[in-house]
């Protein structure tokens, strides 16, 4: 017998439709439930973020209040320490330039001294103040100096009561023997005491300019050490006056020398609250830590290729919302526009560089107009160049705005005109061929002292003042802060 064949039972259309509808409803309910759970999680996260921001904001306000109190206390301490140290320096230096030189140890033995070291150095400085730039010119001027000038310098009294100038050989020998570093420290100490800087005011009312110290190195091209290497000096200047300098050894550079120089300067007057600027060579984590942690100061530093990671991070930032400041200069056939964009340092920059609070981008556009001739006619030529520079600073937006950052940048580059140009051109340092012993460094120090004395006396034109001293003894005495016996 054949097995009985049965047809499979097929669900009816109505049952399928109901099942599909139930599945759709179930899935929709699951999606709605998942959406509700996500919404609840997002709400919880948002609430947590708000609570965290509130706690962070309260913590930040508390930290700001503590920082304000700390800075206020430091400013009060700085005022007291500054007044005390200024009084000590004035007492030590005697108030006059010969008193400053009296603090320099005499390298000669006690026997056979005919001319005191302060009198010889004062006469050399007089010659420099009267425009003598070579060793031959200095010794010739001293040999023919009048009795009143010799007496004012403290030269020895010879037979018949006449003042005797030191010989050219004595002057040359002493300049080669004197401790160049001791002389530089005494001069820097004296200029720092005369500068009498005010302690920085804490900018409670808003951003404001603070005292500025520019650090920059210079090669004395004409001066050569006994080993044949050039003389390099690292200087710290404020207001065109060198208040600290340090010789760079032949087998190193400025980086390991700037820290000891600033620490020594800090012993003369506190640098807390000052703004330190330096070129891109010193854009180092160690320098930033030294400025902010050891000195209590701030920094404004240029970022270039020696910090590739930091430079790339700054170049990759979005500057659309940055605060802006623009300056324009015109003169000598040149127009220069500088656009400064400043904003708070993001977290990635703070992770790369210590104490970074703000970052800046400066776009310099320079247009130079000149005339060129082909022998028949002159043609006016205009050339335009653009340069982009990045900077990092420890100054917060509360302490410095874009206009203040711009002022610190310009103030740093003014060292070229106020210090280096004066020494190179007016005092002819690059043309000097003095090479033996400590003479190059000693005369470089006396050139710094010359410019510093003139500026501290209220004269801005160094060259004109030097010309005037040639015919005005009273002006010379005033610059040296001495009162001659009449």
Predicted feature residues:
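Domain-level cores of phosphate- or acyl-group-handling catalytic modules
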Residues: 259-304
């Amino acid at each position: 017998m054949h097995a009985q064949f049965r047809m499979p039972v097929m669900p009816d259309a109505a049952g399928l439709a109901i099942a599909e509808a139930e599945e759709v409803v179930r899935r929709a309910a699951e999606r709605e439930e998942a959406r509700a759970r996500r919404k609840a999680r997002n709400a919880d996260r948002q609430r947590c973020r708000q609570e965290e921001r509130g706690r962070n904001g309260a913590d930040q306000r508390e930290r700001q209040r503590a920082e304000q109190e700390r800075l206020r206390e430091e400013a009060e301490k700085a005022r007291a320490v500054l007044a005390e140290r200024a009084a000590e320096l004035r007492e030590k230096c005697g108030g006059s330039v010969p008193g400053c030189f009296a603090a320099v140890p005499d390298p000669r033995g006690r026997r056979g001294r005919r001319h005191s070291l302060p009198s010889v150095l004062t006469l050399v400085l007089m010659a420099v103040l009267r425009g003598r730039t070579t060793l031959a010119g200095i010794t010739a001027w001293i040999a023919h100096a009048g009795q009143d000038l010799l007496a004012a310098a403290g030269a020895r009294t010879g037979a018949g009561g006449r003042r005797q100038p030191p010989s050219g050989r004595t002057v040359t020998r002493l300049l080669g023997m004197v401790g160049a570093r001791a002389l530089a420290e005494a001069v820097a100490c004296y200029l720092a005491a005369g500068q009498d800087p005010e302690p920085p005011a804490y900018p409670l009312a808003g951003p404001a300019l603070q005292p500025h110290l520019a650090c920059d190195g210079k090669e004395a091209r004409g001066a050569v050490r006994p080993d044949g290497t050039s003389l390099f000096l690292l200087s710290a200047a404020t207001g065109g006056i060198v208040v600290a300098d340090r010789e760079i050894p032949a087998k190193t550079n400025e980086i390991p020398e700037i820290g000891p120089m600033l620490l020594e300067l800090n012993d003369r007057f506190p640098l807390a609250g000052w703004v330190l600027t330096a070129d891109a060579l010193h854009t180092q984590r160690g320098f930033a830590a030294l400025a902010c942690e050891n000195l209590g100061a701030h920094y404004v530093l240029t970022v270039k290729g020696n910090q590739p990671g930091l430079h790339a991070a700054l170049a990759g930032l979005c500057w659309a919302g940055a605060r802006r400041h623009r300056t324009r200069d015109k003169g000598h056939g040149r127009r220069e526009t500088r656009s400064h964009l400043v904003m708070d340092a993001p977290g990635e920059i703070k992770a790369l560089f210590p104490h970074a609070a703000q970052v800046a981008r400066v776009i310099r556009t320079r247009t130079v107009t000149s005339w060129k001739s082909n022998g028949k006619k002159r043609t006016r030529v205009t050339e335009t160049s653009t340069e982009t520079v990045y900077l990092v600073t420890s100054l917060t937006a509360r302490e410095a705005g874009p206009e203040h950052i711009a002022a610190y940048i310009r103030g740093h580059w003014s060292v070229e005109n106020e210090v280096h140009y004066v020494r190179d051109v007016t005092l002819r340092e690059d043309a000097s061929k003095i090479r033996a012993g400590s003479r190059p460094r000693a005369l470089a120090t006396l050139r710094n002292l010359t410019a510093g004395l003139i500026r501290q006396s209220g004269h801005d034109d160094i060259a004109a003042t030097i010309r005037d001293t040639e015919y005005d003894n009273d002006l010379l005495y005033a610059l040296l802060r001495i009162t001659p016996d009449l």
